[in-house]
From Swiss-Prot:
GO terms for biological process: mitochondrial respiratory chain complex I assembly; peptidyl-arginine methylation, to symmetrical-dimethyl arginine. This is Protein arginine methyltransferase NDUFAF7, mitochondrial. It comes from Bos taurus (Bovine). It is found in: Mitochondrion. The keyword RNA-binding does not apply. Its EC number is 2.1.1.320.
C-alpha cells in the first residue's frame, strides 16, 4: 500500500468541483449540520492542518487517520464495543455465533486430515469474545483435539483492545510478556493453557498451517471512493469547506488518481468503492493457505459487487455523518466480496458469499438454540437466547446484511489431502460446512 500513499494526490489549487450530496440519502444528513454538531475535535484540527499542508486527501487516507492515527485515532485509545461503545457485534449478541464458528474450524481441521498442529489466527479480534466462545467449543470437544498442538495469534493494532482481549482470554492467570519493539508485542497463555501472541501485522504471524478468522475486519479498512463523470472516473476527496473554516466537505479530483487502477474496465456502476488494503490481505491469506494449508473464514457486512455508496459512520449506535466530529465515531464501508474473490487470484478456492442466516442455519443454529432452551427454565435467559437468535437470523437485522466467505485449498474440494503432518486423509466433508448442510460422505 505504500506505493499508493507515496503517489498521493498533490495539492489541488484549481478545478476543485464540489461533490453534491450523492450518497447522503438514508445514511447522512444534508451536510448542513447544526453548529453544535460541528465539534472541533483534536482529529479535525489535525486533518485541517494536514489538508492545508498537502491538499485534499483521499477518503482512504481520511479513514486511516480517523480510525488508526496513533495519537488521536478512534480505535487506538477507547473501548468502542458493547454497551458503552458505538456498536455491538455478533459475538456480543449470542454465544451461539462463536460456538458455531468453533465447530466450523474443527470441521475443516478434520476434513484436512487432523493435522498434528494448527494456528488459529484472528484479524481484529474485538474484545476477544468471539475467540473465547470458540475456545470453549475446543475445550468441550477436547477428546477430538487432545493430541493437537493449538496456538492463538491475534492481529491487533489497538493497544487498548489488545489489553481487553488479554483480560478476556487469559484472565491474567499467567503474567503477560510485553515487548513494544518486537513484532510479537505481547504473549500470554489462555485460561485453558493455549499460548497466545499479539501482532500488529499479519505478515509477522508465522507461516504455518493455520485457520484464519476475519469477523468485521474488512469493513473498517480504508476505501477509495470514485464517481463516474463525463471525463472518466474521478476520485472523491476530502477538503476544507471554503465557507466554514472548521468544516470538511467532499470534492472531486480534477484528474485521474493512482487508486483508479483498481476499478474494473467493465464496471457499470456510476459510483464505486475500492479497498486496495483488503486486496493485499486476501493475497497474503491466499498465498499462505496455498503453501501451508488451512482455511480462512470471513464474515462481514457486504455485497457481491452490486452496491455503490456504503461509507457511513456510527456513534452511540446511531448513524453519524462521516465528516462531522472526526475521531468520535466509527467509520465503515460494506465489503465487496466479488473484489475479495478476484484478489485471491486463483491460488485458493473460494466459497460464497452466503448470507449469515443461511450459513448459521447450515451450521445447525436451530438445533443449538433448542438444546440451550431445553437446558434452562429461567424466563430471562430464554428471552435472551431468543432475542439473540432473532438478531442474528432476522433478514431485516443481521440475517441478510452479513455474509460469509471461505478460502480453502483447491485440493480440499476434491477430497485429497496433501498435508505432510496430517494423520488421516478421510473422511472428507462434502460440502464445506456452512456453505451447504453439515454432512459427511
Amino acid at each position: 500500500m505504500n506505493f499508493l500513499a507515496a503517489a498521493g494526490v498533490r495539492r489541488l489549487c484549481a478545478m476543485r468541483a464540489v461533490l453534491p450530496c450523492l450518497w447522503r440519502g438514508k445514511y447522512f444528513s444534508s451536510g448542513n449540520e447544526p453548529a453544535e454538531n460541528n465539534t472541533v475535535t483534536p482529529m479535525l484540527r489535525h486533518l485541517i492542518y494536514k489538508i492545508k499542508s498537502t491538499g485534499p486527501i483521499t477518503v482512504a487516507e481520511y479513514m486511516k487517520e480517523v480510525l488508526t492515527n496513533p495519537a488521536k485515532g478512534y480505535y487506538m485509545n477507547r473501548d468502542m464495543l458493547g454497551e458503552e461503545g458505538d456498536f455491538i457485534t455478533s459475538p456480543e449478541i449470542s454465544q451461539m455465533f462463536g460456538e458455531l464458528l468453533g465447530i466450523w474450524f474443527i470441521s475443516e481441521w478434520i476434513a484436512a486430515g487432523k493435522n498434528a498442529a494448527f494456528q488459529l489466527v484472528e484479524l481484529g479480534p474485538g474484545k476477544g469474545t468471539l475467540l473465547g466462545d470458540i475456545l470453549r467449543v475446543f475445550s468441550q470437544l477436547g477428546s477430538l483435539l487432545k493430541n493437537c498442538d493449538i496456538s492463538l495469534h491475534l492481529v491487533e493494532v489497538s493497544q487498548k483492545l489488545s489489553e481487553i482481549q488479554a483480560l478476556t482470554l487469559t484472565e491474567e492467570k499467567v503474567p503477560l510478556e510485553r515487548n513494544a519493539e518486537s513484532p510479537v508485542y505481547m504473549k500470554g497463555v489462555t485460561k485453558s493453557g493455549i499460548p497466545v501472541s499479539w501482532y500488529r501485522d499479519l505478515q509477522d504471524v508465522p507461516k504455518e498451517y493455520s485457520f484464519y478468522l476475519a469477523h468485521e475486519f474488512f469493513d473498517v479498512l480504508p476505501v477509495h471512493k470514485f464517481q463516474k463523470t463525463p471525463h472518466g472516473w474521478r476520485e472523491v476527496l476530502v477538503d476544507i469547506d471554503p465557507q466554514v473554516s472548521d468544516k470538511l466537505r467532499f470534492v472531486l479530483a480534477p484528474c485521474a488518481t493512482p487508486a483508479g487502477a483498481f476499478i474494473q474496465n467493465d464496471e457499470t456502476r456510476d459510483h464505486v468503492e475500492v479497498c486496495p488494503e483488503a486486496g493485499v490481505v486476501i493475497q497474503e491469506l491466499s498465498q499462505r493457505i496455498s503453501l501451508t494449508g488451512g482455511a480462512a473464514l470471513i464474515a462481514d457486512y457486504g455485497h457481491d459487487g452490486t452496491k455503490t455508496d456504503t461509507f457511513r459512520g456510527f456513534c452511540g449506535y446511531r448513524l453519524h455523518d462521516v465528516l462531522t466530529a472526526p475521531g468520535t465515531a466509527d467509520l465503515t464501508a460494506d465489503v465487496d466480496f466479488s473484489y475479495l474473490r478476484r484478489m485471491s487470484q486463483g491460488k485458493v478456492a473460494s466459497l460464497g458469499p452466503v448470507e449469515q442466516q443461511t450459513f448459521l442455519r447450515n451450521m445447525g443454529i436451530d438445533v443449538r438454540l433448542k438444546i440451550l432452551l431445553d437446558k434452562t427454565d429461567d424466563p430471562s435467559l430464554r428471552q435472551q437466547l431468543l432475542q439473540g437468535y432473532n438478531m442474528l437470523m432476522n433478514p431485516m437485522k443481521m440475517g441478510e446484511r452479513f455474509n460469509f466467505l471461505a478460502l480453502v485449498p483447491h485440493q480440499r474440494l476434491h477430497g485429497r489431502n496433501h498435508q505432510t503432518n496430517a494423520r488421516q486423509s478421510k473422511p472428507s466433508p462434502s460440502p464445506v460446512a456452512g456453505f451447504g448442510e453439515l454432512a459427511w460422505q
